[in-house]
Regions:
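Aromatic (tryptophan-biased) beta-strands that constitute blades/sheets of beta-rich domains
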Residues: 3-63, 67, 101-113, 160-184
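Repeat-blade elements of multi-bladed beta-propeller folds
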Residues: 15-19, 63-91, 116-150, 186-195
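Beta-rich strand-turn-strand
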Residues: 148, 159-160
């Protein structure tokens, strides 16, 4: 990972959403890195998620079904300014964007056995609750659409599930999608993209 830390980050320069902005444009106006100087970049830090190491030996075949396609996002400075992302097994990790040090880790403990599909998590969504002060739990939340058909809300500062969301931070989406056609494909359906 390469980190460039110009002074005075503004909302326009931060990658706050999965697609960069609320419209998903995947475009940045920043011009600090260009075709002339990109060759001069140096690695600031690296981070290993270790998600493949957590696959039990009896499920080693799953290593072939894992794709790392996440788009990390940056949290606003007032909730830590961390770089947050999810692993293919839906673990959520917050890293100090300047140092690469892990700030917090959340494991939703998805069951790896019943899935026929490939494992992936493409990103997270974030939301600030205008009715809460920044000191309150889940005043700024991250949302994860987990492979096992759960929607999970986490406090962006701590990674702890939001107690007011669903049942202790978790909503089982399966009852809401049972009428999807064709109904015989529901078991194969997985959530991978940000909500």
């Amino acid at each position: 990972s390469v980190v460039i830390t110009p002074t005075g980050f503004s909302k326009e320069s931060d990658w706050l959403q999965y697609g960069g902005d609320e419209g998903g444009s995947r475009y940045s106006k920043l011009n600090q890195i260009n075709t002339l100087n990109v060759k001069d970049l140096e690695v600031a830090w690296t981070y290993k998620t270790g998600h493949l190491d957590r696959i039990p030996e009896q499920l080693s075949f799953l290593r072939k079904l894992v794709g790392f396609q996440v788009t990390p996002i940056i949290l606003p400075d007032d909730v830590g300014g961390n770089l947050v992302f999810c692993t293919p097994f839906n673990e959520v990790i917050a890293l100090n964007a300047a140092t690469g040090q892990q700030v917090w880790f959340y494991d939703p403990k998805i069951d790896l056995r019943p899935f026929a599909g490939r494992f992936n998590c493409r990103g997270l969504a974030q939301w600030r609750n205008p009715e809460k002060t920044l000191s309150e739990v889940c005043s700024h939340s991250l949302y994860l659409a987990a492979s096992d058909k759960r929607l999970i809300a986490l406090d962006a500062k701590t990674g702890v599930p939001c107690p007011e969301f669903g049942s202790q931070g978790i909503v089982n989406v399966l009852p809401y999608i049972k009428n999807i056609e064709p109904t015989n494909q529901i078991k194969a359906m997985q959530l991978k993209s940000p909500p």
